[in-house]
Every structure is written in C-alpha cells, then in structure tokens.
From Swiss-Prot:
Function: Forms part of the ribosomal stalk, playing a central role in the interaction of the ribosome with GTP-bound translation factors.
Top-rank taxon, per record: Bacteria
Organism, as annotated: Bifidobacterium longum (strain NCC 2705)
Protein name: Large ribosomal subunit protein uL10
Subunit structure: Part of the ribosomal stalk of the 50S ribosomal subunit. The N-terminus interacts with L11 and the large rRNA to form the base of the stalk. The C-terminus forms an elongated spine to which L12 dimers bind in a sequential fashion forming a multimeric L10(L12)X complex.
Family: Belongs to the universal ribosomal protein uL10 family.
Keyword annotations of the record: Ribonucleoprotein, Ribosomal protein, RNA-binding, rRNA-binding
HAMAP family: Ribosomal_uL10
C-alpha cells in the first residue's frame, strides 16, 4: 500500500473512531466469510465491522483522541465501530463469540475508557439504555402511587379518628 492510500485509510478510520459511541476489538482468525456476514447482520445498520492494518488503526485511534489501544491492536484484529446503543452491540458480540469460538474479544473503548478483554465482556452484562429507562419510569410510577396512597391515607385516618371520638362521646353521654 502506497503512502497516499495509507493516509486515506487513516483519515477514514479516524473519522470512524470519532463518530463511534464505542469500539470493540476482536480477533477474527478462523471465522468464515458467511460467519462474518452473519455477525455484521446481527450487529445491525448502525455498526460497522472492519479489518484494518493495526499500524494504521493505532495512528487513527490516536488522531481521534483514543489512547491505550496499542496493546490490544496486535495480531489479526477486526474493529467494530458502534453508533448508538453500545451495550446491545456488546451483547451481540459476546453471544456470537460463545457460539463461534474463533471470534475472540480483545478489548473495547467506550465513553472515553479503554477496556481489556474482561472489561469488554463485562460491558455486555450491563443493562441497555431502554432497560434502564423502563426501570426508572417504573420506579417513578411506583413512588407516585405510594405518595398518592399516603396522601389519601392521612385524611381517611383523621376522619376515622374523629368518628371514633364522636362515637365514644355519644356512648359516654
């Protein structure tokens, strides 16, 4: 590859690194073309799965402001650029790696943090944004229902207490 071609690849990769919400690095050695196509399909439209020269990927990552990928970018490495819900992508990659032992998770970078292989696998155990929002909405609804019950219970209790006092006075009289 000649220098202008390398510069073009670095520019493209730099743009991908900058636009991605997360990046997953995997070893793809041993995967067949149909398996890679299947993985790309499962990852969805907002994700790209790319194989690039490690040297060019290192330069692009540094130009994009991502430090710490040098050790991970060794050997045959595929880069998954994720736009959007990177937790869901982590789950897809983890599940695919379980079914296809040839895919090895090497690391990830998300929210300004670089993760080793174990950290990248743990990202898949986190709850996705929609799950967290649903839980949050459920908690708010439950809190509001509890507050409504309490606000309703106070006047009801006061009325019962006054009734009990009135009945007691009527019996005493």
């Amino acid at each position: 590859m000649k220098r202008p071609e390398k510069e073009a690849v670095v520019a493209q990769l730099t743009e991908e690194f900058r636009n991605a919400d997360a990046v997953y690095l995997t070893e793809y050695r041993g995967l067949t073309v149909p398996q890679i196509s299947d993985l790309r399909e499962k990852l969805g439209r907002d994700t790209s799965y790319t194989v690039a020269k490690n040297t060019l990927a290192r330069i692009a990552a540094k130009e994009a402001g991502i430090e710490g990928l040098d050790e991970i970018l060794s050997g045959p490495t595929a880069i998954t650029f994720v736009k959007g819900d990177f937790i869901e992508a982590a789950k897809v990659i983890r599940d695919f790696a379980k079914d296809n032992k040839a895919l090895v998770i090497k690391g990830a970078a998300a929210d300004g943090t670089v993760y080793d292989a174990e950290g990248a696998k743990k990202l898949a155990d986190l709850k996705s944004r929609p799950q967290l929002l649903a839980e949050f909405a459920g908690d708010i609804k439950a809190s509001m229902a509890k507050a409504a019950y309490l606000f309703n219970a106070l006047p009801t209790k006061a009325v019962r207490t006054i009734d009990a006092l009135r009945e007691k006075q009527e019996k005493a009289a």
